[in-house]
From Swiss-Prot:
<dbReference type="InterPro" id="IPR012340">
    <property type="entry name" value="NA-bd_OB-fold"/>
</dbReference>
<comment type="similarity">
    <text>Belongs to the RecO family.</text>
</comment>
<dbReference type="GO" id="GO:0006302">
    <property type="term" value="P:double-strand break repair"/>
</dbReference>
<dbReference type="GO" id="GO:0006310">
    <property type="term" value="P:DNA recombination"/>
</dbReference>
<dbReference type="InterPro" id="IPR042242">
    <property type="entry name" value="RecO_C"/>
</dbReference>
<keyword id="KW-0227">DNA damage</keyword>
<protein>
    <recommendedName>
        <fullName>DNA repair protein RecO</fullName>
    </recommendedName>
</protein>
<comment type="function">
    <text>Involved in DNA repair and RecF pathway recombination.</text>
</comment>
<dbReference type="InterPro" id="IPR037278">
    <property type="entry name" value="ARFGAP/RecO"/>
</dbReference>
<dbReference type="GO" id="GO:0043590">
    <property type="term" value="C:bacterial nucleoid"/>
</dbReference>
<dbReference type="InterPro" id="IPR003717">
    <property type="entry name" value="RecO"/>
</dbReference>
<dbReference type="Pfam" id="PF11967">
    <property type="entry name" value="RecO_N"/>
</dbReference>
<dbReference type="InterPro" id="IPR022572">
    <property type="entry name" value="DNA_rep/recomb_RecO_N"/>
</dbReference>
<dbReference type="Pfam" id="PF02565">
    <property type="entry name" value="RecO_C"/>
</dbReference>
<keyword id="KW-0234">DNA repair</keyword>
<keyword id="KW-0233">DNA recombination</keyword>
Amino acid sequence: MQWSDQAIILGIRRHGESSVIAEVMTPGHGRHLGLVRSGRSRAMQPVLQPGNSVEVVWRARLDEHLGEFRVEPLQLRAARLIETATSVYGIQALGSLLRLLPERDPHPHLYEALAVIVDHLQDPADAGELFVRFELAVLNDLGFGLDLSRCGATGARSELVYVSPKSGRAICREAGAPYAERMLALPDFLSGQNRAADHESLAAAFRLTAYFLNRHVYEPRGVDAASARDGFVHATLKALRTASSEAPQ
């Protein structure tokens, strides 16, 4: 068995004295593991860092085997990804999200989204918005997609300011007003208003996706996967607060 594909490194773990098992995300073969011989060598260590884009060739006798990767570098981002807290926590949190999906299950749109996000992790506003949209895409692929395109009560497409915690559907201002205390806030940038994300809207968006991830994924699976995400959320919102306070009045 053999195939080749582009990939983004999600993580590695030691195997024996000189090798590693690499975890990558590919467009055609999903999240995939493979042994990299001499992966701890001076030549390979800089290549096998989370966030780097590589070309992999996977070989195994049988499809169900772990198999081996031959890895060639394409774009090495890791050096700059360790420069900011948003990027350090971000790449860890993205890997945690992708591990919610079955191994070797192709999700090409998530690979493309991942490639975009890792190039924007150092910009807190862009990284935060892209990360929230990535979480929504993962929820959708897991079968728990939110419908934010129209009001779940009236069908209206304007003044969408709430999300029902029960149905995961957007609710317009008029229909949701009597139940506002029970509703989740729908940030402007997710309601089709083409507004840029800011500290307040991102904080609301993080609460929104956290609610549905906890309800549908983490709690049913008994998974505690919040640490990297919490670190990313904290770093992103802190960076936006700092930028806002330093901006000219």
